[in-house]
Amino acid sequence: MLYNKLITIAALLVPALAAPQGLDVRDCDYTCGSHCYSASAVSDAQSAGYQLYSAGQSVGRSRYPHQYRNYEGFNFPVSGNYYEWPILSSGSTYNGGSPGADRVVFNDNDELAGLITHTGASGNGFVACSGW
C-alpha cells in the first residue's frame, strides 16, 4: 500500500518538475561584449539621456550625455548630432559614478542611432554592439 502511494506521488511530481518554471528570461535584442540588453532597457536608457540633454543638464565626471563625434565611422541609421549615454548592465539608470563600457547613442531628435561599447575596442575607442 505504501508502494502504491509512492508511485502515485511520483507520477504527480514528474510533470510538475518537467514543467517550465518562472525563470527570469531577458530578451536579448542587443549584445555589448557579454552584456545583454532588451529593446525596452535601451529605450529607457535613451529616454534618461535625452531628458538630460534636452534640459541642458549632465551627470558624472564625464558629463553625460555628451556629444559623440563618431571617430570610428559607424554608419548609423539616423543623422544629426550624436550623443552618448551609459547603459548599465545592472538595469539601473546611470546617475554618476562609473559609466561602465556600454553606451546608447542617440541624435538631437531623440532617435536611436545605435549601441556601442569599449569592450573589445583598442584604446579608448568603441566597437558596435550586435543587434543594430
Curated annotation (Swiss-Prot):
What does the entry list under GO cellular component? extracellular region
Read off the Pfam families from this record.
Ribonuclease
Q: Which SUPFAM superfamilies match?
A: Microbial ribonucleases
Q: Which residues form the active site?
A: H66, E84, H118
Domain of life, per the record?
A: Eukaryota
Broad EC category:
lyase
Q: Which reaction does it catalyse?
A: [RNA] containing guanosine + H2O = an [RNA fragment]-3'-guanosine-3'-phosphate + a 5'-hydroxy-ribonucleotide-3'-[RNA fragment]
**Keyword Nucleotide-binding included in the entry's annotation:** no
Compartment list: Secreted
Question: Which residues pair up as cystines?
Answer: C28-C36, C32-C129
Which EC numbers does the record give?
Answer: 4.6.1.24
Kindly state which keywords UniProt assigns to this record, in alphabetical order: Disulfide bond, Endonuclease, Hydrolase, Lyase, Nuclease, Secreted, Signal
Q: Which residues form the signal peptide?
A: 1-26
GO MF, any single term: RNA endonuclease activity
Matching entries from InterPro entries are given as: N1-like, Ribonuclease/ribotoxin, Ribonuclease_N1/T1
Spans traversing the lipid bilayer:
none
What the record says about family reads:
Belongs to the ribonuclease N1/T1 family.
Protein name as catalogued = Guanyl-specific ribonuclease C2
Q: Which organism is it from?
A: Aspergillus clavatus (strain ATCC 1007 / CBS 513.65 / DSM 816 / NCTC 3887 / NRRL 1 / QM 1276 / 107)
